[in-house]
Amino acid sequence: MKFKKFASLALSTVMAASMLAGCGSGAAESTETTSNQTETKTETATTTETASGDTAAVSEVSHDSEYTVDFYDVAANFQGVQSGWYSKIVKDKFNMNLNIIAPQVSGDGAALYQTRCAAGALGDLIILDNADMQECVESGLIHDLTDVIAQYPNLSKYMEQIKAFNSMLGDGSKIYAIPLEMNTNGPTAYKQLHVYTYPRMGWDMYNEVGAPELKNTDDLLNCLADIQKAHPQNDKGDPAYAISLWKDWDSQYMECVAQLTKWYGQEVNGSVLIGTDNSIVPLTDKAGAYYKMLKFFYQANKMGLVDPDSATQDWNMMVSKMQDKRVYLYWYSWQYGFWNTPAKGEEGVNYIEIPVADTNLYQASDTYYGDGRVIAVGSQVSDENFARLMEFLDWYASPEGVQIQHGGTEGLIYTVENGKYVLTEDGLNRFSAEVAVPEDQGGGNWNDGNNQINQWIVASCDINPDTNEPYGTDMWSSTIKMNETKTTKEWSEKFGAADDVEYLLKNNMMTVVPSINIALAIDTTDISLIRKQCGDIIKDASWRMVFAADDVDFEKQWDDMTSQLEGLGWADLTAFDTEKYGPMLEARKAAQ
């Protein structure tokens, strides 16, 4: 295997808003650029100072012709042409339409990727995981940005991170890709208000069942069972369950299980579990957290706590259920957006973290160097379109572009008071209710028109120079003050901490792990085949085990799964991944 010896720090989490767009349907086949004339001709030119002090001018960019951008995006939960309020902003500024090609919802993402790569045109804009980007650079599918990127002032703010990542591509001398979720806060900081994944439930319901101390996941399940027994339906009379799952985010394993492994100090990476102690073990290790948390879901189902729709529903259905309070356990921090509001907090009904004493949370640090995905321009685009795409990317990294991505639009979503941003009522409710967008801003429902790219160049924790506060709405001083409610005050009084981050750190229940953004070894043809076959087995078996008939059936299915994997070359795959992640662990040790 061939590894680059450079490592940099990055975040492996996905920021709060990055998962809020639901899955969609619709054709996302490659479209040709059209040449319809707009009513007015717009040209832009930018003059900037490069890192060397030389003045460089960006060529004039004409927006005279409409440009439909084929956007291949592994982060997207929507497939088709962006619509609604975000579409209007992009169309008005750049005369562009974004045709999002989403392997995650295409039915067969691997086949889509291979087909488009073979055709020599993956997309005009491309978001990929690091390893796939490395492969595409070597295949000639990615446009060289080396000679132009310094001309773009907003991208240039992150030149340290951009150069660090690109030093791992090719011979390290050129710039091809821009890391995503970067910030300027420093490489080892964790400045989020909440941990990324942890048990969360309604404060009112937790107190209603006696606010029990939770020593382990058995106690957590018993608490949830009491809540579901008291509330088998929501206020509308719809059935409600402690736990609801969805499978359309699954990749090589059951994603819902993989997120919960972090509660017990391990993160799933390919076929292996990487621990807070820098250990690596196979995902199939019975002493590992994947087995433990898969069994947690099985035990929950045996107790009648798992939504029977889980095996068939998609993310859209899940969102609807959260908005109607039909799900009693959350784990992602960003799920708060589908229910919590300051008003509900004053009623004491917001969801909030509930400590489980035996957890040791695997929490990655903030995303200084990027999160493991990158954005690039396809090599097949014309010179004219290349200039337009670079202009768009620079805006996407600008304070205006970042503010729109993380905070929405002024007037509808927030107002400006004394130089600070304050969420409106619609802003507070934009993910939990139907917020109508005025026709002159694009019309429709706000959430439906949200940015379907679903990843950002700049993370929400970065500082907006216009306010000297983070871009993320939950980190605005006005929002923090609004969220100081009956719920948070009672929680702090009970647990003796200002928030979950403070509580978990103080009680040695959380380890902040330096995130590593490194171009890892690319799968060989044989390993790629083994990974696909093993991934299909793991996903199928994991879902079946959640609904196993009894303990004996669960154990038999686990053993059958591991036997099947061994016959497919599992040992070779885990050996490959163990070596693959070795440089990442060495870089992590150096950063600790």
Place the predicted regions along the sequence by residue.
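Ligand-binding "clamshell"
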Residues: 135-148, 340-362
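General small-molecule cofactor/ligand-binding pocket signal
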Residues: 97-103, 308-309, 352-354
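Conserved small-residue motifs centered on glycine
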Residues: 403-540
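C-terminal motif of bacterial Sec signal peptides marking the signal peptidase cleavage site
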Residues: 18-22
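Helix-loop-helix "hinge/cap" segment bordering the ligand-binding cleft or interdomain interface
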Residues: 152, 174, 179-253, 274-321, ...
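Bacterial Sec-dependent N-terminal signal peptides
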Residues: 1-10
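Paired acidic/hydrophobic, glycine-rich loop segments that form the ligand-binding mouth/hinge
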Residues: 123-127, 328-333
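Conserved N-terminal structural module of periplasmic/extracytoplasmic solute-binding proteins
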Residues: 8, 24-219, 255-258, 264-273, ...
